[in-house]
UniProtKB/Swiss-Prot annotation:
Keywords: Acetylation, Cytoplasm, Nucleus, Proteasome. Non-catalytic component of the 20S core proteasome complex involved in the proteolytic degradation of most intracellular proteins. This complex plays numerous essential roles within the cell by associating with different regulatory particles. Associated with two 19S regulatory particles, forms the 26S proteasome and thus participates in the ATP-dependent degradation of ubiquitinated proteins. The modification N-acetylmethionine is found at M1. Detected in liver (at protein level). Belongs to the peptidase T1B family. InterPro entries: Ntn_hydrolases_N (IPR029055), Proteasome_beta2 (IPR035206), Proteasome_bsu_CS (IPR016050), Proteasome_sua/b (IPR001353), Proteasome_suB-type (IPR023333). It comes from the Eukaryota. This is Proteasome subunit beta type-2. It comes from Mus musculus (Mouse). Its main location: cytoplasm. The 26S proteasome consists of a 20S proteasome core and two 19S regulatory subunits. The 20S proteasome core is a barrel-shaped complex made of 28 subunits that are arranged in four stacked rings. The two outer rings are each formed by seven alpha subunits, and the two inner rings are formed by seven beta subunits. The proteolytic activity is exerted by three beta-subunits PSMB5, PSMB6 and PSMB7.
Amino acid sequence: MEYLIGIQGPDYVLVASDRVAASNIVQMKDDHDKMFKMSEKILLLCVGEAGDTVQFAEYIQKNVQLYKMRNGYELSPTAAANFTRRNLADCLRSRTPYHVNLLLAGYDEHEGPALYYMDYLAALAKAPFAAHGYGAFLTLSILDRYYTPTISRERAVELLRKCLEELQKRFILNLPTFSVRVIDKDGIHNLENIAFPKRDS
């Protein structure tokens, strides 16, 4: 039902998520933010069971911030991804597993931009582009066709829009607006939301 997408460029990561909060077949909100700021240059995108997403993301968020307060420096995106994955794996083997799918995007001064894909079974993979949700089945082929490692920001936004337009055309559910953000050496920046007009009945 939900959709996340991430595209890594040479010096940035572009991410987007839908803004719908739904319960079963009922839409509860159309302005729900599924992105959680871990640190100045790390963003966690989270979809899944309604309670699990917020509880798990905020738990990781507070622990990453606690690490900075204790040590005086922030975790790198790689370290944050492995910390998140370990916590998800530990919970999976407990009585209270979290049913969440994640994208973690960040920028490190030494390693550059990074995008990590994580699913509810705690599988972790570094990827040049990634997507979660049913929409991933419709858009991963577009990303595979048009993505290049040296893609510019303008071309990445065009590619993102192409994916979202395909979603509007082929996906039966209504996902009208998407939050878009970019992470680079200067931090996390909000881009203009991408919105689509409601379909004619």
